[in-house]
Amino acid sequence: MPIEAVAVASLPMASRSAALCFSSAAAARSRSRSRHGRMAVSCDAGASDLLYSSLAAKLLGPPTSFDAGKLTVEFAHSHGNSSSGFPRAYTLTHCDFTANLTLAVSDTIAADRRLRADDVFAEWKQQQQQEGMALHVHCFVSGANLLHGLAAGFRYYVFSKELPLVLKAVVHGDALLFAEQPELLEAKVWVHFHSSSNAKYNRLECWGPLREAANAETTHKRHALEQLHNAITKGTRRRRRKWSSPDAIFSALLALLL
């Protein structure tokens, strides 16, 4: 008689994120719906789609809503609390336990901060000729941590899903800059996804004007995310018979607990 399901692990109070730690909020919602707070891993190949869909639903849930009350802004000494212009860079960090956001505004991105793969970095750059300024955002999908490579697809999706929240934090936290230079809201947003372990996720995307990119309901990005979700769902059917292997189960757990 085949084993239908095996409870393998209790989820932690606050899991590390697949990217930016935003998946921890989804994990909390999933735990609140589970009576025992455990994840069932099916050993039956016929039930693999259900398992993978549950895993995807946890990480690919709705975007996190921006709450200005949870945002703390820290200005470097050279900027003070005013819009002192450029160069200008941002580092956004997230706390698992409180869901608080911290936006650090500085001249440049410190090299040691780039090693924190769950943070998001952004900087203003002058474009060629008369195109004005553009905001370049950097997300580290995989490479710094071997375990991140096993969950690269999920990390890429979570970064994409939560990027409007990041941009809203920048616009709100650096409000004086945008008050003095409102044209920056029309600046293009270029998103650099960095992945040294998976070339598929090592890519550059143009998200359009900042005003639109910060809107989670933007039609273009919503359509793109739906396409990515469908691609992952199709991948589920192709991998149906692989879920009984220890490697597949291990990868799923890493995606949940990173």
UniProtKB/Swiss-Prot annotation:
Query: What is known about the tissue distribution of this protein?
Result: Strongly expressed in leaves, stems and panicles, and at lower levels in roots and seeds.
Q: Name one Pfam family in it.
A: Staygreen
Concerning what turns on (or off) its expression, the entry says: Down-regulated by dark-induced senescence. Circadian-regulation with a strong expression during the transition from dark to light.
The record describes the protein's role as:
Promotes chlorophyll degradation in leaves. May be involved in LHCI proteins degradation, regulating the balance between LHCI and LHCII.
Assigned protein family: Belongs to the staygreen family.
Q: Which PANTHER family match?
A: MAGNESIUM DECHELATASE SGRL, CHLOROPLASTIC, PROTEIN STAY-GREEN 1, CHLOROPLASTIC-RELATED
UniProt protein name: Protein STAY-GREEN LIKE, chloroplastic
Q: What is the lineage of its organism?
A: Eukaryota, Viridiplantae, Streptophyta, Embryophyta, Tracheophyta
